[in-house]
Design a protein with these regions (language model features):
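Conserved acetyl-CoA-binding loop-helix of GNAT-fold acetyltransferases
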Residues: 91-106, 123-131
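Acetyl-CoA-dependent GNAT
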Residues: 37-88
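A short, well-structured alpha-helix characteristic of acyl/acetyltransferase catalytic modules
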Residues: 1-52
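Hydrophobic adenine-recognition pocket in adenosine-nucleotide-binding enzymes
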Residues: 15, 85, 118
Length: 147
């Protein structure tokens, strides 16, 4: 995979092991709750297992914003999209732009829909996904119909 330029501020960088950069994102308890509904930070082992899974079951990228890695996004082979933006960079419309690009990538792969699983308390993510065109189909399930 090659880097994918999203716009003048955001580039997807293909995943490579970089725990020194990524682990601090997953040390933030608010982010851990948003992502996994857990109240403890990721260990290095948990982070490595997560990325080992994501990078072998889909297209996994770091999100580079203005030259800084600020999160990750994956389009899984099972049509699920996963995204994390570290807290310091949330509310800058980074997630929205990344998910819109993931919809394009899903179309290119011939996927007919993509799903996102969002916890009921994560209203910030729910609003963003709904505003893009995802439809809530279950307590935590949101689907974007491509075809």
């Amino acid at each position: 995979m090659k880097p994918i330029i999203i716009d003048s501020e955001i580039t997807f960088i293909p995943y490579y092991p970089d725990p020194d950069t990524a682990l601090p994102w997953y040390q933030d308890l608010d982010v851990c709750r948003q992502v996994d509904n857990i109240d403890f930070p990721y260990s290095l082992e948990r982070l490595q297992k997560m990325y080992a899974f994501l990078s072998t079951h889909g297209d996994c990228f770091y999100i580079q914003y203005r030259g800084v890695l600020v999160g990750d996004v994956t389009l899984r082979d099972d049509q699920e999209v996963c995204i994390v933006v570290c807290k310091d960079y949330q509310n800058k419309r980074i997630g929205r732009r990344c998910i819109l690009k993931m919809i394009e990538l899903a179309k290119e792969k011939g996927m007919d829909q993509i799903t996102a699983n969002i916890y009921p308390f994560n209203t910030q993510s729910q609003k963003m996904f709904l505003s893009i065109g995802f439809v809530k189909t279950g307590e935590e399930t949101y689907i974007y119909q491509i075809s």
